[in-house]
Regions:
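Beta-strand-loop-alpha "switch" segments that mediate conformational coupling across diverse proteins
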Residues: 136-147
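Membrane-targeting and insertion segments and their boundary/processing signals
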Residues: 46-50, 98, 147-151
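Short catalytic/ligand-binding loop motif for oxyanion handling, primarily in non-cytosolic enzymes
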Residues: 67-69, 110-111, 146-147
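Short, glycine/serine-rich, charged loops/turns that create anion-binding
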Residues: 17, 107-108, 142
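Short aromatic-enriched loop/helix-cap "lid" or pocket-rim segments at secondary-structure transitions
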Residues: 23-26, 114-115, 147-152
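Short, glycine-/small-residue-rich phosphate/pyrophosphate-handling segment
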Residues: 71-72, 85-138
Length: 181
């Protein structure tokens, strides 16, 4: 919504709705032919990658499971970045510039993210540097996972505390996401 509010054209893709695979390390993107810098494999991710490489900005989000983004997110990063990464000198074959905003949602509190997750997620942020743009990361922490915790084996969480945190923090998270957009 933030990008649209300043006149940007936007397009939304839900990776869960696509039939896709991660990088197969076929190295066709490293051939000194027409496939250099482009992923050879064709699936639903092909159009997404092409549109990202033609865009000015990529806003991407993923929940964090077991300390990492989803497999679909990883598949996109593999296919998008590996094909533009030069094995000659470590530079980028990509001559354009795509600014990237990364949004992570997680059940963990912000303190845990800062102490235990931020550093491991920095690798993903580094990979986006091959798109030659600015990179902004925003963690949305201590999220509500379900509307009624009593229906689940989740006694380790207090629904009351989760809801209080959401009331305090979620409006700020929305505002920040809008600004980044």
């Amino acid at each position: 919504k933030g990008a649209e509010s300043v006149g940007a054209e936007t397009e939304y893709f839900n990776l869960y709705d696509l039939v896709l695979k991660g990088c197969r390390s076929c190295l066709a993107c490293k051939l000194k032919t027409k496939t250099k810098g482009r992923c050879y494999w064709r699936d639903d991710l092909t159009e997404v990658i092409d549109k990202i490489l033609d865009a000015d900005c990529l806003l991407i989000g993923s929940p964090i499971y077991f300390g990492q983004p989803t497999s679909e997110f990883r598949a996109l990063v593999e296919r998008l970045i590996f094909c533009v990464m030069s094995y000659d000198d470590g530079s980028s074959y990509f001559s354009g510039k795509v600014n990237v905003g990364i949004f992570y949602t997680m059940n963990a509190p912000l303190e845990f993210y800062e102490q235990s997750m931020k550093e491991s997620l920095a690798t993903t942020e580094y990979l986006f540097s091959f798109l030659n743009g600015e990179i902004v990361t925003y963690p949305v922490c201590d999220t509500i996972q379900v509307s009624d915790y009593s229906k689940f084996n989740m006694a380790g969480f207090s629904q009351e505390l989760k809801e209080k945190q959401w009331i305090l923090q979620f409006p700020d998270d929305l505002e920040k996401a809008f600004e980044i957009g």
